Amino acid sequence: MEAPRPLHVLLVHVWYWPHVGGGNQHVEQIGRELVRRGHKVTVWCADVPAHEEKRFERGGVEVIRIPPSRVLNGVDPVVSIRGLNLSGVDVIHLHDTLPILIRRTLAKAKRAGKPVVTTFHNDYVKRTISGKLLKRVRWALQGRRTLHASDARIVLTPHFEGLLRKKGVRGDLDVIPNGFSPVEDSPVEPSALEGRDSSRPLLSFVGRLSEQKGVDVLMDAMDSYEGDPGFDLAIAGKGELSVWLEDRHGKANSKGIISVLGLVSDAEKRWLYENSTAVIIPSRFEGLPTVLLEAMNSGTPVVMADVNGLGGMVEQAGSGISVPREDYLSLASAMTEVAHADIETSSRWSSNGVATAQSYLWSSVTESVLGVYHRVVGD
């Protein structure tokens, strides 16, 4: 049987390196895996934050950063793609459904007769009445239309498959999870943790400092303890709540046992995974977070907020503890439980996590994505 031909794949996502986040890491890893398999990959993204180079190669992937005229509500860059063309592109893979860059690329692809694959990554939570109404209107007028106009649709979990059906999405949905690549850098202890009493359990948060990731819920949990909970907490990452966290940390009851590390290197992240008693993920909403997969692969138990079926996934895998979303008291209780679990329980969580993570390696995930590409191009 003849092997499928090499493809030129255009990946489109608002955010990309050097922006920090799970979505752009997802896109970058797919791109790198495709390049390793002999395919050509181009990325279109918004130039946010502004980067000196607008066109460059990273990991074998051609990156085109498009400067926006403005950014709507701080999350949707207004970009023009008139000067870009789709000549030679075999398939366009959109990562999201609503942003201007996504919808304009979809329209351009349809005019050019190019097949489009769209991945639905997440269902964002809105709290205000106006926000919920706007979300519903945008979904009906933009998000659902993006999916229906696509030649194939990918969701990360069975939970999102069910959600999109409830939202009125028709047609086939391919369930292909987020993936991860094991950190290859040798572990390096973050300098802020040097000299820490290593006999105390260490719990770690690794992620963007944002409302979505629940760092405020984590701090509420820490402040709920009347005394020393018997463990230390490391918070690694940066984001829109970095300044807020610095202030909150300074006022925290448990300030002395919390280390705010800022953005860490891959080597430091690996050290945290390998030396933490558990990784804490108190998110308000998620797709399938890379930190969850990386932690499990490292044999580190997790405490996962039960959002979009992820708590159930952790419980089914037997790799840690699930807690209700935004429930800081339940989170505090789970953190105490995981920090002081007996060796047998910790070992069981660890081994179950490692076994579960193997099916989420990028090599396996990309093979499934490639199958979708070849299907829509007719190979």
Q: Which residues make up each language-model segment?
A:
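Short hydrophobic beta-strand element within catalytic cores of glycosyltransferases
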Residues: 301-305
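Carbohydrate-associated surface elements
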Residues: 159, 179
